[in-house]
Swiss-Prot record:
Encoding gene (name): ymcA
InterPro entries registered for this protein in UniProt: Bact_com_dev_regulator, Biofilm_formation_YmcA, Com_YlbF, YheA/YmcA-like_dom_sf
Function, in words: May work together with YlbF to regulate community development.
Coiled-coil segments on the chain, per record: none
Species of provenance: Bacillus subtilis (strain 168)
Protein name: Uncharacterized protein YmcA
Disulfide partners: none
């Protein structure tokens, strides 16, 4: 059995990160983000939302509840308008695709590490038990 250092593992993680950054999903994400940054309508709405959010913070601080409700309603309306823009929808979809890929990689690594531990200790993969667990459960009486 080869023993790896944390440094070795981190280097492999960097290699994997580079591979992930060169996938179709990440490429689409980059293009969608660029389209958003170049879209004047998106920029205008985002700036309006930011300005209203600052107002909302001030109104909340000074306990201007009715005015705060009005500003929050304007923010909600602008956010809905933003979400209806096709490039925003494409960007959100691409974010989800990249996130799904990252989750898949994380789960795969976790599951594989668990499986390697089980098999390297002579355990039972089907039961998800390590070798020591299998060994000790065979020697004990059942209730």
């Amino acid at each position: 059995m080869t023993l790896y250092s944390k440094k070795d593992i981190v280097q492999q993680a960097r290699n994997l990160a580079k591979m992930i950054s060169e996938t179709e999903e990440v490429d689409f994400f980059k293009r969608a983000e660029a389209q958003i940054n170049e879209n004047d309508k998106v920029s205008t709405i985002v700036n309006q939302i930011k300005a209203l959010q600052k107002q909302a913070v001030n109104l909340k601080h000074y306990e201007k509840h009715e005015a705060l409700k009005q500003v929050e309603a304007k923010i909600d309306a602008l956010q809905e308008e933003l979400e209806e823009i096709p490039v925003i929808q494409e960007f959100r979809d691409s974010q989800m695709e990249v996130n799904d890929l990252l989750q898949l990689v994380a789960h795969t690594i976790s599951n594989q590490v668990t499986n390697e531990i089980i098999t390297s200790t002579g355990g039972d993969l089907l039961k998800g038990e390590t070798g020591s667990k299998v060994k000790h459960s065979n020697n004990s009486c059942s209730l």
